[in-house]
From Swiss-Prot:
Entry annotation: catalytic residues: 135 (proton acceptor)
Subcellular location: Synapse; Postsynaptic density; Cell projection, Dendritic spine; Cell projection, Dendrite
Positions of region (Calmodulin-binding): 290-300
Consequence the record notes for mutating residue 212 to Q: In MRD53; increased basal autophosphorylation
Identification of the protein by name: Calcium/calmodulin-dependent protein kinase type II subunit alpha
Gene expressing this chain: CAMK2A
Residues annotated as domain Protein kinase: 13-271
Length: 478
């Protein structure tokens, strides 16, 4: 039976000029022929996508379908055809909010208040729908049209995640350096408050035209953010009302549990009583500074695009959605989205849980060991004499009779760990384990084993489902 290929996009829409470009996607203006309605089509080349990238695409489409709000770019349709996927969005023609501000003849604190109010309305809707954007920044704040007073629209949900209520978890290292929250940089569990931190950074820029945290060196930038090291320098901040500074302070609160929420921020007097609280004085210095800030952003974006194009052209394998490991470390990437959850951070996590498991074994701590093992775990190990062991009873015997008696110090070293990441929830680690210990006569000894462990993550917790260990069997002391 022949496979039926969907051609709905090709039949219903006509494509026009390019509006933007990513590593695996291009955005083009399109028209729904029968209705004569204009849209923006994000066209993803699915032939180049990994299984993980396919998952991310499905997640983005699912999230965008959920969100229906006047301050969010609306997804109207999602169509999959042979080799390409089409996401049909509102056509927003007003360009970036920050570019529009610098072209205005008049711009005041009250205007900044109105801008951040619309951004917060969008964020509140996301949070009410169980969505965290994770990449709020000027590039993703657009205007519906070029008309005066056009609505601000939040765009690009490529990094957005779905959360349950106020759930905090480690969803991976993702975002844009200058807008990352302290909890993400600390690699702590995080959730909705990361969006409010980014709103604080955006509001700061809206008021003076430069960011609260800035350093060409990314490591120093991250240290500033983790310490919450920003201030309100003279003279530019002298003309900003105390209420505006108060809202920034509440957004840029290091502790996410004490940070203001979107709903609370919308009730803040600087927003809810804008006409009487926010200053209406024209801020020419802010406009001038913002022009330089925009120019720097565009230059860095152009440099990064060139670097990525050179890398891809020279046959290097692209890291997916505008992201590249090599570029991430560059000081040029301060306004570029990064998503590091695929590689170094996740591999370090696997090494860490493996070290914790071995520590539990060395300490004879069966309770901790059981928490890190699936109840149906399988194993090949020297003590089982070539048999496949299932469950934890076989291992319990050695904890109770070997390690509990051996109170002498044990020192373990993991050598040459190799990690294979298998999707989001599974990983395999292979390494050599060197164990130093004192024998019954108090003489130092060294044992070596070669080990492979397969980890699986359930409900955010890593557990061993299988391991294979070679080397000499453990011997009970006489």
């Amino acid at each position: 039976m022949a496979t039926i290929t969907c051609t709905r996009f090709t039949e219903e829409y006509q494509l026009f000029e390019e509006l933007g470009k990513g590593a695996f996607s291009v955005v083009r203006r399109c028209v729904k022929v029968l209705a004569g309605q204009e849209y923006a089509a994000k066209i993803i080349n699915t032939k180049k996508l990994s299984a993980r990238d396919h998952q991310k695409l499905e997640r983005e489409a699912r999230i965008c379908r959920l969100l229906k709000h006047p301050n969010i770019v609306r997804l109207h349709d999602s169509i999959s055809e042979e080799g390409h996927h089409y996401l049909i969005f509102d056509l927003v023609t007003g360009g970036e909010l920050f570019e529009d501000i610098v072209a205005r003849e008049y711009y005041s604190e009250a205007d900044a208040s109105h801008c951040i109010q619309q951004i917060l309305e969008a964020v509140l809707h996301c949070h009410q729908m169980g969505v965290v954007h994770r990449d709020l920044k000027p590039e993703n704040l657009l205007l519906a049209s070029k008309l005066k007073g056009a609505a601000v629209k939040l765009a690009d949900f490529g990094l957005a995640i779905e959360v349950e209520g106020e759930q905090q978890a480690w969803f991976g290292f993702a975002g844009t350096p200058g807008y990352l929250s302290p909890e993400v940089l600390r690699k702590d569990p995080y959730g909705k408050p990361v969006d409010l931190w980014a709103c604080g950074v955006i509001l700061y820029i809206l008021l003076v035209g430069y960011p609260p945290f800035w350093d060409e060196d990314q490591h120093r930038l991250y240290q500033q953010i983790k310490a919450g090291a920003y201030d309100f320098p003279s003279p530019e901040w002298d003309t900003v009302t105390p209420e505006a500074k108060d809202l920034i302070n509440k957004m840029l609160t290091i502790n996410p549990s004490k940070r203001i929420t979107a709903a609370e921020a919308l009730k803040h007097p600087w927003i809810s009583h804008r006409s009487t609280v926010a200053s209406c004085m024209h801020r020419q210095e802010t406009v001038d500074c913002l022009k330089k800030f925009n120019a720097r952003r565009k230059l860095k974006g152009a440099i990064l695009t060139t670097m990525l194009a050179t890398r891809n052209f020279s046959g290097g394998k692209s890291g997916g959605n505008k992201k590249s490991d090599g570029v991430k470390e560059s000081s040029e990437s301060t306004n570029t989205t990064i998503e590091d959850e695929d590689t170094k951070v996740r591999k370090q996590e696997i090494i860490k849980v493996t070290e914790q498991l071995i520590e539990a074994i060395s300490n004879g701590d069966f309770e901790s060991y059981t928490k890190m093992c699936d109840p149906g775990m399988t194993a090949f190990e020297p003590e089982a004499l070539g048999n496949l062991v299932e469950g934890l009873d076989f291992h319990r015997f050695y904890f109770e009779n070997l390690w509990s008696r051996n109170s002498k110090p044990v020192h373990t070293t993991i050598l040459n760990p190799h990690i294979h990441l298998m999707g989001d929830e599974s990983a395999c680690i292979a390494y050599i384990r060197i164990t130093q210990y004192l024998d019954a006569g108090g003489i130092p000894r060294t044992a070596q084993s070669e080990e492979t462990r397969v980890w699986h993550r359930r409900d955010g917790k890593w557990q061993i489902v299988h391991f294979h260990r070679s080397g000499a069997p453990s011997v009970l002391p006489h």
